[in-house]
Structure formats: structure tokens, C-alpha cells
């Protein structure tokens, strides 16, 4: 049922479209053949009898029924004529004092212009009345001549003549010839030679082109018009007015035709072309959100460690300002000389980057280590609270020149320093991190970063660390272990990276206090026990200084994030929304284009595979056909020829069998 309804609806729609197209074609046809109605007006006169009966007609035309009119025997009329009762026709004598208003006078002059303008033009052109009447007669018989084309008009305009007519009794041999157009009035219309026929406006007679007349011709034309009841200067002024009106009507009609042309279902493309043509010369201004500049925000304060580490983590190459001189640790005792050297290195780095060195904090890391922490390639965990609300997994890839300087904590319990990002501790700040680092590390005590964890040396007697994180380190050189001296628990296990190392970390955080941040946290904390069982128990209280730092930075970071969100105006919100929509659309278009390219490539591959398979089939069929022909030929040849010796026939048959098996083997099929 639904299919029948759809079929009927399609049929009706097709009929409606056909009717519309037919109506448009009919309208175009009538517009094409439309002409001036005055051209179809014809007056025919012929002699006819008043009385159909011949006897009555003879009696009526006999001189007996004729009588002189008003006693004049030269003027005989029928006695049954009504004019016989007009005994006297008085002459009209206008009054001497006639009061005519200016409006009536102007109307009378306009009427005289409409009545006699054809005669004025004929008098100006020097054309007699007989020539005009004969031309009208020719036009009534054969119709008006076709309008000249544009090229002919230009040629004739150069010769100062539009269309030349030859009259039988024409004796006018002037250069100026006339163009003609039939009039609606009884007066004949003939024009001057330099007048151009108006093609579009049929209501206005063919006018003299007043723009091409000089002053003498204008004065002569006005003088000719004064004899027909017009004031001096009226004729040329009214001609100009008629020309302006004709141009206005022509323009309006062209606009109407253009609108009619670009209407309907079939001309959407034409309407679009017309719109593009109209907008081609117009300068289109960009939209408001694209015209305005980006809004500028007041700078807000951030912690120096956050800003510096964030800027460092985004750059993949070391900036020239941060390329520093590499210093090597020569003593591991945490002596005063080492602290002084670390402070000097921090001052040098601060002078290089234009920032003052950070003062050493009690209970925190040593000054040398604090200076080296600012040179690391990613955000430290103390500055990670700015991105505390992000819930996505972050990957940061950074390549920077990093090294670790300074000494370690001097621990009274002889515990080695461990990373705070312990993946299996049961504290609230648990993080699971995976890191993959590539590069060369030449270390004196084993390579280790913030995502590599090593057990205490109680289990291992040397410096080689055992990693509990899932990390793979590919290095051109093997890790060279240092000398195993006496049990020196405060010795350093730090390493230097002489080449920029790329590391990717996937950090998962389960606690709300520590965020998922784009960082390779390399901070270290003190542990209170070297043995693994004591480690797990003492892990929550392992780093009191870092915990205090985190507690202090949490509210500060909250304030910063609160202050870092300026209120957006509706225009800026709209701009952001528009930019997001544009980015989304651009990504969708790009994705669609890629999918289309992939699909086209897939189709091309399928076509190639099909062609290859068809070629393979054709070759196989050709090979089979050749083998059949060869077998037929061999069979016929063996019948016709004499049978050879048994030894020869045996060798021949074996060679044939061997060649046939080779040809049929799949290795030879392509």
C-alpha cells in the first residue's frame, strides 16, 4: 500500500513538474513573439449598398429623390438624409477674453505634443506627407521591416543613417534618411535620420535622439514645433523627458525579465550564477569573530617551578639558555665543599636563565639537588596540583638535557633515597607509572630516573639496581657498574645523561590529592628502612618534608586556578564555541577525506586484484588450449608416422610425460 501511494505521489509530482515546464515554455514563447498591439490594428473600408433590393436602390439613387442642400444646386443630398434638417450651421467665434489656467495651458501643450510630434519630425526632416502615407501603406501590406542587429546599427550610426528607405517618388537626396514606425494616431510618423528606433518601448513613437543634436538643430526643431501650438523649447524638453521615461521602463522590464528567468525549479543553477555575478564585485567582510583579534588576558602569577617546568616539558629540544656546563661529582660525603659547589652551580644557572636561585629549604632536598630539579625535563610532583582536575591519561614526551647534581640526603639510618612514585605502596598517593626511555646513559652508579625503583643494597652488594617498574631501557652501551667499595650507604646512586633522553610516561593516580599530570616525576624521598618488609610499613611517613610541601602547595594551587579563570564575556564564549565547532568540522572533513581516500585505494586494489585474477584465468585457459592442441597434434603425428624403435619410443614417451608434468605443475602457473 505504501509503495502504491509513493508511486502515485511520484506520478503526480511528475505531472506537476511537466505542467510547470510546459507553462514556462509557453510563457517564453509568448514573450518571444510579443509585439506592439498597434501593429495588429488594421482599418478596412469598402463600398456597400444601403438597400439590398436593387429596385429600392435604384429608386433611392435616382435624381428624383435628390434635393439641393441649403438651396445650393451644386450640393445635392438625399431627401431622406438627416442633414436636410440642418438649415443653418452657425460659425464659431471664440470669446475675446479667454481665461485659461496654467494647468490647462500645460495640458494643452502636452496634448499638442502628442498630436503633432510626428508632423514636427517630418517637417524637420523635410519629408512630404505623400511619402509618409506611402510608407504607411507599404508597412500595412508587408509589415514593418526587421529591426537591425547591433553590428548594423553601429555601422549605420557611423554613416549618420539608421535605415535607408527608397521611395518611388522620392527626390530627397540628403545624407539624412528616416526611420519609420507606425503611429497609434491618424497623423503619419516619419523621423529624422539620426534618430534611433526604440526597441523596447512600443508606446512612445520613434523619437529624435536629442543627445546627438547640436544647438542649431535644437533651435530649428523648437521653431518647427511652435506652429503646432507648443511653446518655444517644449518639444525638445518633452523629447528628453520621454527618453528618460523610456530608459526607466526599459530597465524595469529588464529586471522583471531577469527575475522571471531566475525563478522556478529548473533554474537553481542560474540563480546561483546570478547571485555570484552580483556578488563578484562586492567585497565581503569576514565574520565578527574572525575580524576581531584574540582577547588578551592579564598575566596571573604562577609558581616559578610550575612555569619553568611546564615550559620545559613542552619543548622537545633544549633551549640555548638552558644549556649548562656539566659538572661531575667527585666526592660523596655531603661535605661543605659539595654544598658550596652546588650553590655556585645554582647561582650560575639562575644567572643564565635570568631567575634568582631558590633558597635552600629546611627539611627538604639539598640546595644542589634543588638546583638540578629546576633543570629537569618535566613537571615535578610539587607543581603538579595545577592539573589536579584532569582525568585523562597524559603522555608527555620530552627531550632535554638533564643531569643530576648535588649530594644526597645524609641519612642517619643509612637508607638509600627512593622515588616517591612507588607503584605498589599502600599510601593514598599511589601511582602506577610505566616509562619507556631510550637513550644512552653513562652512569657511575647505575642509571635510574623517577620511574625506576631499586631495592636496598642489603640484598645486593653492589650498585646495580633492580627495577620494579615495567620499563625497558635500550642503550648502546651497557651499564657500567662502579667499584664495590666498602659498605658506604651514603654514597650516591645518581646518574648523568650525556645525551637527551626521550621518555614517555603513563601515570595513573588513584588518589584525589595527587593529580594525573604531564610529568616524569624525579623527586626522591627518604625511606626509613633498607629492608623490604619495613619499607611497606614505613612508606606513609617516608617523606615528611615533601608531604608538607604538597599540603602547602595544594591550597595555593587552588587559589591560582581560581584566579586563573577570568570571566568570559558572551562574545568570547561565542567565539570559543565557534572555534570549537570549526575545529570539529575541520577534523570531521579531514577524517571523511581520509576515509574516502582509503576507500578509493581499497577499490583500486580490488580492481587490480580482479584484473590480475582475470589475466591469470585467461593465461591458464590459453595454456590448456595449447596443451590440448599439442596432444591432438602428437596423437595425429603418432598415427601417421611409423612407430620408432622400442628404446627410442620409451625415451620419447618418458620425456613427453616429464615435460607435461612440468607444464602442469603449479610452479609454472602465473
Swiss-Prot record:
Residues 581-643 form a coiled coil. PANTHER family: CLK4-ASSOCIATING SERINE_ARGININE RICH PROTEIN (PTHR13161:SF4), SPLICING FACTOR SUPPRESSOR OF WHITE APRICOT (PTHR13161). Residues 356-365 have a biased composition (Pro residues). Keywords: Coiled coil, mRNA processing, mRNA splicing, Nucleus, Phosphoprotein. Residues 171-232, 258-670 are annotated as: Disordered. This is CLK4-associating serine/arginine rich protein. Probably functions as an alternative splicing regulator. May regulate the mRNA splicing of genes such as CLK1. May act by regulating members of the CLK kinase family. Its main location: nucleus. InterPro entries: SWAP, SWAP_N_domain. Signal peptide: none annotated. The modification Phosphoserine is found at residues 101, 285, 294, 331, 335, 543. Residues 182-214 have a biased composition (Acidic residues). One of its GO terms (cellular component) is nucleus. Residues 265-283, 411-443, 481-491, 655-670 have a biased composition (Basic residues). The keyword Phosphoprotein applies. The modification Phosphothreonine is found at residues 327, 569. One of its GO terms (biological process) is RNA splicing. It comes from Bos taurus. Residues 290-313, 586-613, 621-637 have a biased composition (Basic and acidic residues). It comes from the Eukaryota. Phosphorylated in vitro by CLK4. Residues 340-355, 378-400, 492-529, 638-647 have a biased composition (Low complexity). Probably interacts with CLK4. It is found in: Nucleus. Belongs to the splicing factor SR family.
Amino acid at each position: 500500500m505504501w509503495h502504491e501511494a509513493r508511486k502515485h505521489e511520484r506520478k503526480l509530482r511528475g505531472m506537476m513538474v511537466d505542467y510547470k515546464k510546459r507553462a514556462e515554455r509557453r510563457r517564453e514563447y509568448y514573450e518571444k513573439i510579443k509585439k506592439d498591439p498597434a501593429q495588429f490594428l488594421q482599418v478596412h473600408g469598402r463600398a456597400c449598398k444601403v438597400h439590398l433590393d436593387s429596385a429600392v436602390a435604384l429608386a433611392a439613387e435616382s435624381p428624383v429623390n435628390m434635393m439641393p442642400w441649403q438651396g445650393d444646386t451644386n450640393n445635392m443630398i438625399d431627401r431622406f438624409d438627416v442633414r436636410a434638417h440642418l438649415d443653418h450651421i452657425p460659425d464659431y467665434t471664440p470669446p475675446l477674453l479667454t481665461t485659461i489656467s496654467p494647468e490647462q495651458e500645460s495640458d494643452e501643450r502636452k496634448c499638442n505634443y502628442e498630436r503633432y510630434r510626428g508632423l514636427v519630425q517630418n517637417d524637420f526632416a523635410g519629408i512630404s506627407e505623400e511619402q509618409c502615407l506611402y510608407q504607411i501603406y507599404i508597412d500595412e501590406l508587408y509589415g514593418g521591416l526587421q529591426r537591425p542587429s547591433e553590428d548594423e546599427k553601429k555601422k549605420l550610426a557611423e554613416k549618420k543613417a539608421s535605415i535607408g528607405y527608397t521611395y518611388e517618388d522620392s527626390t530627397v537626396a540628403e545624407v539624412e534618411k528616416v526611420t519609420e514606425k507606425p503611429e497609434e494616431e491618424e497623423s503619419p510618423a516619419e523621423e529624422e535620420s539620426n534618430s534611433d528606433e526604440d526597441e523596447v518601448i512600443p508606446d512612445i513613437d520613434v523619437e529624435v535622439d536629442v543627445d546627438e543634436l547640436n544647438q542649431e538643430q535644437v533651435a530649428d526643431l523648437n521653431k518647427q514645433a511652435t506652429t503646432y501650438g507648443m511653446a518655444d523649447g517644449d518639444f525638445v524638453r518633452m523629447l528628453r523627458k520621454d527618453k528618460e521615461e523610456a530608459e526607466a521602463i526599459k530597465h524595469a522590464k529588464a529586471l522583471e525579465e531577469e527575475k522571471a528567468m531566475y525563478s522556478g525549479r529548473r533554474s537553481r543553477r542560474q540563480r546561483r550564477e546570478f547571485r555570484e555575478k552580483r556578488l563578484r564585485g562586492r567585497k565581503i567582510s569576514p565574520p565578527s569573530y574572525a575580524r576581531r583579534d584574540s582577547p588578551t588576558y592579564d598575566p596571573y602569577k604562577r609558581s616559578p617551578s610550575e612555569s619553568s617546568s611546564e615550559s620545559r616539558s613542552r619543548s622537545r629540544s633544549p633551549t640555548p639558555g638552558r644549556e649548562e656546563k656539566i659538572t661531575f661529582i667527585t666526592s660523596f660525603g655531603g661535605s661543605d665543599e659539595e654544598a658550596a659547589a652546588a650553590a655556585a652551580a645554582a647561582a650560575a644557572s639562575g644567572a643564565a636563565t635570568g631567575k634568582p636561585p631558590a633558597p635552600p629549604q629546611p627539611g627538604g632536598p639539598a640546595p644542589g639537588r634543588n638546583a638540578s630539579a629546576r633543570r629537569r625535563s618535566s613537571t615535578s610532583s610539587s607543581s603538579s596540583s595545577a592539573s589536579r582536575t584532569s582525568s585523562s591519561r597524559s603522555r608527555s614526551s620530552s627531550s632535554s638535557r638533564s643531569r643530576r647534581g648535588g649530594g644526597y640526603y645524609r641519612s642517619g639510618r643509612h637508607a638509600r633515597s627512593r622515588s616517591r612514585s612507588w607503584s605498589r605502596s599502600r599510601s593514598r598517593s599511589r601511582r602506577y607509572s610505566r616509562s619507556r626511555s631510550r637513550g644512552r646513559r653513562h652512569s657511575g652508579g647505575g642509571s635510574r630516573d623517577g620511574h625506576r625503583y631499586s631495592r636496598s643494597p642489603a640484598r645486593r652488594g653492589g650498585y646495580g639496581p633492580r627495577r620494579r617498574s615495567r620499563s625497558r631501557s635500550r642503550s648502546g652501551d651497557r651499564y657500567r657498574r662502579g667499584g664495590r667499595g666498602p659498605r658506604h650507604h651514603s654514597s650516591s646512586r645518581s646518574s648523568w645523561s650525556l645525551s637527551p633522553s626521550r621518555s614517555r610516561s603513563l601515570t595513573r593516580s588513584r588518589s584525589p590529592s595527587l593529580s594525573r599530570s604531564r610529568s616524569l616525576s624525579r623527586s626522591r624521598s627518604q625511606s626509613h628502612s633498607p629492608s623490604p618488609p619495613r619499607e611497606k610499613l614505613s612508606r606513609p611517613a617516608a617523606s615528611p618534608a615533601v608531604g608538607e610541601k604538597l599540603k602547602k602547595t595544594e591550597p595555593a594551587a587552588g587559589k591560582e586556578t581560581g584566579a586563573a579563570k577570568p570571566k568570559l564575556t558572551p562574545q568570547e564564549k561565542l567565539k570559543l564555541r565557534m572555534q570549537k565547532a570549526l575545529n570539529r568540522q575541520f577534523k570531521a572533513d579531514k577524517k571523511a577525506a581520509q576515509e574516502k581516500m582509503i576507500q578509493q585505494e581499497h577499490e583500486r586494489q580490488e580492481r587490480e586484484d580482479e584484473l590480475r585474477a582475470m589475466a591469470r584465468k585467461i593465461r591458464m585457459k590459453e595454456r590448456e588450449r595449447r596443451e590440448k592442441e599439442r596432444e591432438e597434434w602428437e596423437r595425429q603425428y603418432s598415427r601417421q608416422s611409423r612407430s620408432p624403435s622400442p628404446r627410442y619410443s620409451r625415451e620419447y614417451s618418458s620425456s613427453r610425460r616429464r615435460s607435461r608434468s612440468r607444464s602442469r605443475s603449479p610452479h609454472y602457473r602465473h
